[in-house]
């Protein structure tokens, strides 16, 4: 049985050498953070065309979620793939009632939302970019599909980009709660319509942390999550929200953003 993964760096691991035509892999390490960048340049491969950036760091349950080195590492990679101007809609994807799936909503809750402050002539003096945040919930509890809700919001708000934050699946136990993936290819939530430029009509960037892993027990497939998942989600959501806020509001320091969203 093939073990599923959302992490592109696990599909095209740099240590294996050869990759298919149309795939480029780059690796780097700085300040104890490993980076694997996978560029998929054509369709028909194991992942959609786009850039996938994986940052490997210590387990979220053990780190300071306001550590500026980690915040900067994620923020700088986000800035490299997000448009430089215009409204960004942060969408917290997932079910907040299920701990391992609550990363998206928890991150959106901590977002520094500014759209309501950036509509007057004084907006230039505020040094702020317009940002909105939304956690659509899950269809089983709302009766509304995430794609439907985001399509409506995107049509109304016309954002420069939608940033979707979600929990991911990994095939590597060492990456559970210890990696971040950023993708320009959008997001396909579990058994739900894809959230992409084609479906939402604007650029879609996905941001996530692997919180679950499939295992084949022989008799049946299992999905497992770390025993410290509560701490992982709490600190990962805090760090990711700071990184998103820093990427979108570079004029503010990490300390200022932490104060403004506390």
Give each language-model segment a name:
Residues 1-50:
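N-terminal amphipathic/basic leader segments beginning at the initiator methionine
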Residues 41-81:
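An N-terminal, well-structured beta->alpha segment
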Residues 56-58, 87-98, 133-137:
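Short glycine-rich or small-residue beta-strand-to-loop segments that form or flank ligand, phosphate
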Residues 93-101, 140, 167-171:
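Gly/Ser/Thr-rich loops at beta-strand to alpha-helix junctions
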Residues 95-129, 133:
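Glycine-rich phosphate/diphosphate-binding loop of Rossmann-like nucleotide-binding domains
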Residues 126-154, 158:
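A structural-propensity feature for long, helix-poor, extended segments
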Residues 147-194:
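Glycine-rich phosphate-binding loop
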Residues 200-262:
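C-terminal functional extensions of proteins
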């Amino acid at each position: 049985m093939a073990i599923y993964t959302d992490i592109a760096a696990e599909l095209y691991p740099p240590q294996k050498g050869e990759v298919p035509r149309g795939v480029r892999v780059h690796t780097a390490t700085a300040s104890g953070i490993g980076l694997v960048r996978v560029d998929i340049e054509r369709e028909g491969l194991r992942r959609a065309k786009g850039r996938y950036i994986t940052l490997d760091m210590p387990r979220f349950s053990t780190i300071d979620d306001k550590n500026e080195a980690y915040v900067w590492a994620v923020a700088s990679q986000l800035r490299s793939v997000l448009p430089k101007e215009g409204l960004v809609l942060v969408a917290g994807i997932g079910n907040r009632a299920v701990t391992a799936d609550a990363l998206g909503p928890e991150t959106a809750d901590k977002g520094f939302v500014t759209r309501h402050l950036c509509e007057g002539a004084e907006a230039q003096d505020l040094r702020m970019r317009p940002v909105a945040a939304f956690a659509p919930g899950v269809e089983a509890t709302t009766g509304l599909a995430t794609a439907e809700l985001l399509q409506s919001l995107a049509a109304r708000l016309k954002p420069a980009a939608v940033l979707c934050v979600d929990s991911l699946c990994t095939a590597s136990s060492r990456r559970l709660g210890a990696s971040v993936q950023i993708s320009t290819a959008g997001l396909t939530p579990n058994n739900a319509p894809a959230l992409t430029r084609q479906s939402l009509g604007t650029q879609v960037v996905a941001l996530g942390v692997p919180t679950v892993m499939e295992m084949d027990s022989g008799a049946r497939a299992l999905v497992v999550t770390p025993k410290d998942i509560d701490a992982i989600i709490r600190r990962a959501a805090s760090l990711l929200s700071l990184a998103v806020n820093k990427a979108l509001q570079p004029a503010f320091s990490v300390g200022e953003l932490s104060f403004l969203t506390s």
